[in-house]
Amino acid sequence: TDYLLCGICLLWMTGCSNMLDEMRPKDKIPQDALSESDLTKLLNGVYAEMEELVFKFYMDGDVKGENFKAGPGFSMNDPMSMAPSSKEVLGQWQKCFTALKQVNFLVETYEASSNKDSQVVKQTGGTGYYFRALIYYHLVTRWGGAPILRKRTYDVVPISPEADVWNFIKEDLGKAESLLPEFTDRFYVSLSVCDALNAKVCLALKDYTNAAIYADRVITKSNFALSTTSAEYANAFISNSNSKELIFALANKRSTGLLLFYQSVNDIDPTWDYSPSADCYSHLYADTSCLLYTSD
């Protein structure tokens, strides 16, 4: 009896093994099996990836515009140099494409969806197209031409001319514009942030007429207003800000996040990287006299 029972159990286990091998997912959810609940989690993951990308570029304009001075922990790059030998420059290029891989997964998921009328699916597509346009905006404004990747690939893709990259950005923003909802929360991509990037793209291309049109779409909304004092302007950069200048912001928590701006930009730590230059302090506000800061 024992031998018979063991034989039956062995037969049952080997018979089921093939069925178990064919079950999905083994270690992840297949792209074609993502539910709307899964898409929400996927969106959150892409937001986290984009936070790292934005962190890479957040201070770049100030560094290259010489608003900062270099500290003992870092040597300032020549603002006219974009040499690949620079660790910072190479890191920015690489981060664009690691983030692009995740964003393209989002875009591919939207494009393959059979339920494009769903608000969650629309948000997925609109966010993906916007983030891809933002990535390529960072690329084209620094390097000009860049490889255009509409889908994830490990193939070597040649660099496209700068004009083609700008056209790709405008194409993606057009798609995002048709999918994104109106502004409700600064921590989520909305139609307003798409309009804001469209305005920057038009400015870069010297299309001033359309730049003004896109900018007006944002400025004329009651959700937003320009700061009128230095204190109001500074309020945009603090935690839990209620500034009406904020159109889109990625949530960065010092308590849980690893991306800490104060570790790079301060003049207190022994190995600080950057701090604002004296000229930056003295010319930042028209009403500088009302501030407690000094340029020392």
Task: Enumerate the predicted regions with their spans.
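Bacterial Sec-dependent N-terminal signal peptides
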Residues: 1-25
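Acidic, glycine-rich segments characteristic of secretory precursors and extracytoplasmic regions
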Residues: 16-61
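Aromatic-residue-lined binding/catalytic grooves and analogous aromatic/hydrophobic interfacial grooves
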Residues: 17, 145, 170-183, 191-232
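Conserved, well-structured interaction surfaces
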Residues: 40, 73-142, 156-160, 178-181
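Elongated scaffold/linker segments in the mid-to-C-terminal portions of large proteins
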Residues: 87, 223-295
